[in-house]
Amino acid sequence: WKLEEIYNLKDLFEKWTICFVPILNPDGYEIYENDFFAIRNPIYRQMLRMQEVSCKEFTGNARGIELRKNFPTGYYRRKQIHQQPASENETKALVRLFQDDPGRGLLSFGYAGKRIVYFRQSQAFTANQKSYRMARHLQKCSASDMDKKNFHLEDVEPAGRQGYGSPEQFYTEICHQPAFRIEVPCENEVHAASIEKQIEYREIHTLPLEYIFSL
C-alpha cells in the first residue's frame, strides 16, 4: 500500500476516487499504429488520405476532427463553417463525465514539448493563483534534481488560442476546478524502450498523487 515509500495509497483510496480515461482519441491511436487502413469508412479514409498528412503526424479522429479543439468552450472557434462543438462521440463522452462528476481537478497527459500547462478561469483571481501554485508544485515534483526544473511552466488565458475548444479549458469553465496538461516529448519507438523513457515516466507517474495530497 506504499508507493515510492512516500504515498500511503490505502488511506488515499479510502477518501478519494481517481478516474482514468486512457485514450481520448482511440481512432488516432489506431491510425498511428495501422495507417489509414484502420478507418473502416472508405469515404473518410479517402478524404484523410487526400490531405497528404502522414499517419504518424495525424492528430484527428476517423472523421478528421481534432478532438482537442472540439469542446464547447466559451471562446470556441470554428475552423470550417460546418464544424460544431461537441460534434464527436468521444467529446460527448468526456463532457458527460465532467457533468456527472465534476471532481476536484483534471490532469491530462499528452505528447508535445516538455511542459506543465495550467488553465485560467475568467474573473477568478484567487482560483488562478491557486492553480499557479499547484502548477509550480507539480513542476518541482517532476524534477529528478530539485534544483533543476525539467518541465517548463506555462499558463493559458480563457481567451487564449491554446484554450479554444480544449477539454481542460472546458473543464475549468463548467466545473470551476483546476485543470492542468502535462506534456512530454514525442519520440520514436527506439526511444520508447530506452532508459530515458523510464526516467521520463518516473518524473510524472506520481503527479496525480501529489495533486490529491496537496488539496
Tell where the protein language model's regions lie, with residue ranges.
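C-terminal accessory segments enriched in acidic
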Residues: F71-L215
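Active-site/substrate-binding loop(s) of hydrolase catalytic cores
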Residues: W1-A127
